Amino acid sequence: MIEPLSSSYAEARSAFLEAAAQAGSRIESFPHPLKGLGGEDLAIDVAEVGPIDGDQVVLVVSGTHGVEGYCGSALQRAHLSTLGDGEHAGPTLVFVHALNPYGFSWVRRVNEDNIDLNR
């Protein structure tokens, strides 16, 4: 079941990191230099499940257009919740949460430089 959408970037990030930890993911965060709408720290978070040296990788990205991050984050969390404790058989799964954390927090399609990352 897909949980309701988060009401803010900070809430979505916290829920994603919790879901990733519960799935036994390897997690790495890449801080963003600016602050979010509520003064929160911004980051691109990456959770990886499965073989470290796997030949097959599935990349799942949310928030390329920041405002779309709310839905993408919920879908990533839903997928992570199906994985159990990290004993994933199959391709390595890499979840990139909030590729555009500034746009996600400020509810904008574009990043802090008014650039659409998908163009």
Where are these regions (language model features)?
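Structured catalytic-domain cores with a bias toward divalent-metal coordination
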Residues: 1-119
